[in-house]
Curated annotation (Swiss-Prot):
The lineage of its organism: Bacteria, Pseudomonadati, Pseudomonadota, Betaproteobacteria, Burkholderiales. It holds the Pfam family PGI. Catalyzes the reversible isomerization of glucose-6-phosphate to fructose-6-phosphate. It comes from Cupriavidus taiwanensis (strain DSM 17343 / BCRC 17206 / CCUG 44338 / CIP 107171 / LMG 19424 / R1). GO terms for cellular component: cytosol. InterPro entries: G6P_Isomerase (IPR001672), G6P_Isomerase_C (IPR023096), Phosphoglucose_isomerase_CS (IPR018189), SIS_dom_sf (IPR046348), SIS_PGI_1 (IPR035476), SIS_PGI_2 (IPR035482). This is Glucose-6-phosphate isomerase.
Length: 547
C-alpha cells in the first residue's frame, strides 16, 4: 500500500505544519528566489510551479515518495517493453510510436520501430494523395471533406490535435480538406454532419481497434448507407472509406479493402493512440510534416522524462504535486485552463487521459486501495472560464488546483488581443495565490463590513503555469506527452494499472439486452427503476414507429 511507505507518513506529518502557511508570505520573503527554485524548462515548455503550497522540504519528501513508490523502476520497465499492463498482459509502448527510425524498442523480443515507420510511410503517402487532390472519389471529384468516425481515444486525441493546429491547415501549400468528427451513437451527431456534405467529395475514416465498437460501427454502417443511397456503387466504396484497425478480417467483412487499412498494435491503449495510425486524420488536416513534428515533440518529452533526475523532471514534478493535493490536502477535483482557443479541447482530452487511466480503486495486486486516486478533471479555455466557474475557484468552499497553459505568441494575430489574454491568465494565477484581505479593502475606502466580507478573497489557492513560445506541432507533442507521463507517475504511486479500463465494460454488456427489449417484445430481469424506464421508452418508440 502506498500509505505504508515512509515518505507517505512523513508527508502526512509535514502537511500538518503547512495547514496555516500562506503562499503570499513565502513570496514576500523569498521573491525571485522562489521562482528560480520552482521553475524549469523542457522540450519547449516552461513550467512555473512556485504558486503551490510547497516548501523545499515538501518537494524533497514528494521526490522521496516517488523513489520509494518505484517511479524510476516502473518507468524503465515501460520503456523496455515489459508487460506493465498486467490485467491484459500487454506491453505499454506508445513512446515507441514517436521514436526516430533508429530507436530500439522491443515487444516480446521483436523490434517494433521498423513496423511503426512502415505505417508512417503509408500515412505520409496517403495524406499527400488526399491533400494534393490525387485521391479521387467514385466520380473523379477531389476530396474536400473527411469524417473521422471513432469514439474515446479514436476521437478525442485526433480531434483535439486537429483543432489545436488548425491554423496550419494549409501551411504545406495544399488546400486541406475540412475535418469532421463523429463519435456519439446518437444519430443526430452523424445526421447533422452528413447533411452538410457532398458524398462524391467525402472520405470516411473508420477508426476502431477491434472494428466491433458499438458506436463506431453503427455510425460507419449508416455512413455507408448514405453513400449507397446517393448512388455510389458498392464496388466504389473503397474510394470513400479507409480503416484504422488491428482487425483485418472485420475490415474486409465491412467492405473496406484491407489495402486501405492502416494498422496499429494491441500494446497501444486507445487514449495514448493519437501518435499511431489513429492520427491519420491529423495528417489529412495539417499535413504529414506537421504530424512528424508532433511525434518529435512527444519524443523530446519522452527523453526528458527518461533521463532527467526526479527533482528536475517535469512530468514527475506535476505528477507528485497532483498526489500532494489529492491525497494530503484531500482535494477531489483539478482544473485545466488553457488560455488559447486553439487548445479548447485539451481539457476534454485530459479528462479521459487522467480519469480513464487512474479512476481505479484496486491495486495491481488485486487489493482495494486505501486512499484516493484520480481527481475529477474539468475545465475550459480562458477567458471563457472566468465568466463561468472561476467564481467558485476563487471564493468557493472547495479549493481547486488549476493548471494554466498559454502560448506567448498566438496562432492567429489580431492587434491588442493577445496581451489582454495573457494579462488575464497571469492575473488569475496571481489572484488565486495572493487573494485580497479585509484590511486591503478597508484601506481602499470601503466601510460596509458586510460588503467587505463578500469581497474578501482568501487566496492561498494553488496553480501551475505552463508557457510555450508558440503553439507549434512540436511543442503540442511535448505538452501531450507531459500529461501522459504525469498520469503514469501518479498511477505508479497509487499502485494501480493506468492502462486498462474495465469500468466501461459492464454498462456496454447490459446495454445489449436492453436494446433488444427497446426494439422488440422481450422482457429482461431488471430493478424496478430500470424496468420502468425501459417500458416508458418502448411505449414512445412503438408509438413513433406506428405513426
Amino acid at each position: 500500500m502506498p500509505t505504508d511507505l515512509h515518505a507517505w507518513n512523513a508527508l502526512l506529518r509535514h502537511h500538518d505544519t503547512l495547514r496555516d502557511a500562506q503562499m503570499r508570505d513565502w513570496f514576500d520573503r523569498e521573491g525571485a528566489q522562489r521562482v528560480a527554485q520552482c521553475s524549469l524548462e523542457a522540450a519547449g515548455l516552461y513550467l512555473d510551479y512556485s504558486k503551490n503550497r510547497i516548501t523545499p522540504q515538501t518537494m524533497s519528501l514528494l521526490m522521496q515518495l516517488a523513489a520509494e513508490a518505484g517511479v524510476t523502476r516502473r518507468r524503465d520497465a515501460m520503456f523496455a517493453g515489459e508487460h506493465i499492463n498486467t490485467t491484459e498482459d500487454r506491453a505499454v509502448l506508445h513512446v515507441a510510436l514517436r521514436a526516430p527510425a533508429g530507436a530500439a524498442f522491443k515487444v516480446d523480443g521483436e523490434a517494433v520501430v521498423p513496423a511503426i515507420h512502415q505505417v508512417l510511410a503509408r500515412m505520409r503517402d496517403f495524406s499527400a494523395r488526399v491533400r494534393s487532390g490525387a485521391w479521387k472519389g467514385a466520380t473523379g471529384e477531389r476530396i474536400t471533406d473527411v469524417i473521422n468516425i471513432g469514439i474515446g481515444g479514436s476521437d478525442l486525441g485526433p480531434r483535439m490535435v486537429c483543432r489545436a493546429l488548425s491554423h496550419l491547415a494549409d501551411a504545406d501549400g495544399h488546400a486541406a480538406p475540412r475535418m469532421h468528427f463523429v463519435s456519439n451513437v446518437d444519430g443526430t451527431d452523424l445526421a447533422e454532419t452528413l447533411v452538410r456534405l457532398d458524398p462524391q467529395r467525402t472520405l470516411v475514416i473508420v477508426c476502431s481497434k477491434t472494428f466491433t465498437t458499438l458506436e463506431t460501427m453503427a455510425n460507419a454502417r449508416s455512413a455507408r448507407a448514405w453513400f449507397v443511397a446517393s448512388g455510389v456503387a458498392e464496388q466504389d466504396l473503397a474510394k470513400h472509406f479507409v480503416a484504422v484497425s488491428t482487425n483485418t478480417e472485420a475490415v474486409r467483412e465491412f467492405g473496406i479493402d484491407p489495402a486501405n487499412m492502416f494498422e496499429f498494435w494491441d500494446w497501444i491503449g486507445g487514449r495514448f493512440s493519437l501518435w499511431s495510425s489513429v492520427g491519420l486524420s491529423i495528417t489529412l488536416a495539417v499535413g504529414f510534416d506537421a504530424f512528424s513534428d508532433l511525434l518529435a515533440g512527444g519524443h523530446a518529452m519522452d527523453e526528458h522524462f527518461r533521463t532527467a533526475p526526479l527533482e528536475r523532471n517535469m512530468p514527475v514534478i506535476l505528477g507528485m504535486l497532483g498526489v500532494w493535493y489529492r491525497n494530503f490536502w484531500n482535494l477531489p477535483t483539478s482544473c485545466m485552463a488553457p488560455y488559447s482557443t486553439s487548445l479548447e479541447l485539451f481539457p476534454a482530452f485530459l479528462q479521459q487521459l487522467e480519469m480513464e487511466s487512474n479512476g481505479k480503486s484496486v491495486q495491481l495486486d488485486g487489493q482495494r486501495i486505501r486512499t484516493h486516486t484520480s481527481p475529477v478533471v474539468w475545465g475550459t479555455a480562458g477567458t471563457n472560464g472566468q465568466h463561468a466557474y472561476f467564481q467558485q475557484i476563487h471564493q468557493g468552499s472547495q479549493v481547486v488546483p488549476v493548471d494554466f497553459v498559454a502560448p506567448l505568441v498566438p496562432p492567429r494575430r489580431l492587434p491588442g488581443h493577445h496581451a489582454k489574454l495573457l494579462a488575464n491568465c497571469f492575473a488569475q494565477a496571481e489572484a488565486l495565490m495572493r487573494g485580497r484581505s479585509a484590511d486591503e479593502l478597508r484601506a481602499s475606502g470601503l466601510k460596509d463590513e458586510v460588503r467587505i466580507a463578500h469581497m474578501v478573497f482568501d487566496g492561498n489557492r494553488p496553480s501551475n503555469t505552463l508557457l510555450m513560445e508558440d503553439l507549434t506541432p512540436n511543442v503540442l507533442g511535448a505538452l501531450i506527452a507531459l500529461y501522459e507521463h504525469r498520469t503514469f507517475v501518479q498511477g505508479v504511486v497509487w499502485r494501480i494499472n493506468s492502462f486498462d479500463q474495465w469500468g466501461v465494460e459492464l454498462g456496454k454488456i447490459l446495454a445489449r439486452p436492453i436494446e433488444a427489449e427497446l426494439t422488440g417484445t422481450a422482457t429482461g430481469q431488471h430493478d424496478a427503476s430500470t424496468a420502468a424506464l425501459i417500458a416508458r421508452a418502448r411505449a414512445v418508440l412503438k408509438a413513433g414507429a406506428a405513426s
